Regions:
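Alpha-helical elements of the RecA-like P-loop NTPase motor core of helicases
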Residues: 15, 118-119
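Conserved GNAT acetyl-CoA-binding A-motif
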Residues: 100-113
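Conserved active-site tyrosine of GNAT-family acetyltransferases
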Residues: 121-127
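Short glycine/proline-centered loop/turn elements that form peptide/ligand docking sites
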Residues: 93, 116-117, 137-140
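Conserved acetyl-CoA-binding loop-helix of GNAT-fold acetyltransferases
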Residues: 79, 85-100
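A conserved beta-strand-loop-helix scaffold within acyl/acetyltransferase catalytic domains
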Residues: 6-9, 14-78
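Residue-level detector of high-confidence beta-strand sites
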Residues: 57, 130-132
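Intrinsically disordered, low-complexity, positively biased terminal segments
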Residues: 1-2, 135-185
């Protein structure tokens, strides 16, 4: 199997990103198209390539503000079946976090798709539980509210807490238990 190479996404990657998204998550074309229309920018996504196609992807979406601190959200981390176990998602996640911090974001959060992934986000990306799923607290741009409406109600199958990692020196104490409404779950 070919060596993995990592880079930022490009406009021309959208068909392959869509293919990988459908393959891993099974979402329909309307949902994926709405995400790309509402929230995606090439610089928000990192990919791994191998064998001439995308092997893994992850998105880090800036925009939320929690008690005056800028936040970003890791979303849709996905690795194609043949490339799993090669640490592609971990490397993409770490690069997304580093890029967010380099751009001035104070903390990066995510809502794991299922309880079993919480340990992965803790051990691989250094995240810990911080925000409550749903409810008031964190402020979001209008585009996030629009995509959240497209997503519908929160899934009872996702964890009740979002996991996060702060930039060095950021105190997360005042944020503990703050509500994070726009989870796209």
């Amino acid at each position: 199997m070919s060596e993995l190479s990592f880079r930022l996404s490009r406009e021309r990657d959208v068909p392959e990103l869509t293919r990988l998204w459908r393959e891993v998550f099974g979402d329909d074309e309307d949902f994926i198209s709405e995400f790309f229309r509402s929230l995606w920018r090439p610089e928000y996504c990192r990919v791994a390539e191998a064998d001439g196609k995308l092997a893994a992807m992850g998105f880090c979406l800036p925009g939320p503000v929690a008690n005056g601190l800028s936040c970003a959200y890791i979303y849709a981390m996905a690795t194609a079946e043949p490339y799993r176990g090669r640490c592609a998602a971990q490397r993409i996640g770490l690069e997304l976090i580093r890029g967010a911090f380099d751009s001035g974001v104070h903390l990066v959060a995510t809502l794991p798709a299922e309880e079993s992934l919480c340990r992965w986000y803790e051990s691989r990306l250094g995240m810990a539980p911080l925000f409550r799923k749903g409810g008031p607290g964190v402020e979001f741009p209008q585009s996030w509210h629009e995509f959240s409406r497209f997503c519908g109600e929160h899934s009872p199958e996702t964890p009740d807490m979002l996991w996060a990692i702060p930039a060095p020196g950021v105190d997360t104490g005042p944020l503990r238990g703050l509500g994070w409404e726009c989870c796209f779950d």
